[in-house]
Amino acid sequence: MKLFAAMSSVLMSASLLFGATTAQADQLESVQQKGVLKVAVPQDFPPFGSVGTDLKPHGYDIDMAAYLAQKLDVKLELVPVTSANRIPYLQTGKVDLVISSMGKNAEREKVIDFSAAYAPFYLGVFGSSDETVTSAQDLSSKTIGVTRGSVEDLELSKIAPSDATIKRFEDNNATLSSFLSGQVSLIATGNLVVTEIATRYPAKAPQTKFLLKNSPCYVGVMKGEEALLKEVNRLITEAKQDGVLEGFSQKWLKAPFPADLGA
């Protein structure tokens, strides 16, 4: 009898373990059954995610989360996170997805999976509309403003022609002022900085000339959740084709969605 009881206990434990593993292995089904999609989003990083004057979250990432929830036909639950805790929240099941202006790198790929890119995030050379610049070679004999010691300074220095003049400023504000005042007609900076210029000074909004360093944003998915990852990727592809991401980019980044954004 004791042996039978012991075997029954082992079988029951194995059954429970198998059931738990199966449930965890299909998070998409779990989301659909619960009718709720929990998404980790930023709360202090405009224009991707911040709290507005109405005390509600707004931004590119917020709109992306709402789009996915709507397409999955479930309610959306936004979970504010920081850069430090967004991946742990995903790993511990506190959220189903991370949509928090997150870039992809080798270390992160060891612990979570990433969707296709859904938003542009990059450093580049930007300038006025009358500057016909499309590559580093076109910077020959031109002057480019940049913040001293920044990543964009380092990237620009690697590729600028020897006869290009790199005019370095001590901080971002000085770099932006040099462009707005007409001191320089080209600057190397990030697309979010350009978004800020376009928001405050629409008539002087610089145009993207070419990229220096590309690090687009991806949706984070728990490792091994293939069904959920596949569905998120399908919806991102649909959003590209239907112009949804173009709308998000124009609304929040004041720029077109890049046609060649990395997968």
Q: What label would you give each PLM region?
A:
Residues D26-S101:
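Extracytoplasmic small-molecule ligand-binding "clamshell" domains
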Residues L37-K38, D73-K75, T92-S100, T143, ...:
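Alpha-to-beta junction loops
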Residues N85, M102-K110, E155-K158, L180, ...:
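A ligand-binding cleft/hinge motif common to bilobed small-molecule-binding domains
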Residues V151-R168, A205-T208, T237-A263:
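Ligand-binding clefts/hinges and TM-proximal coupling segments of bilobed small-molecule sensing domains
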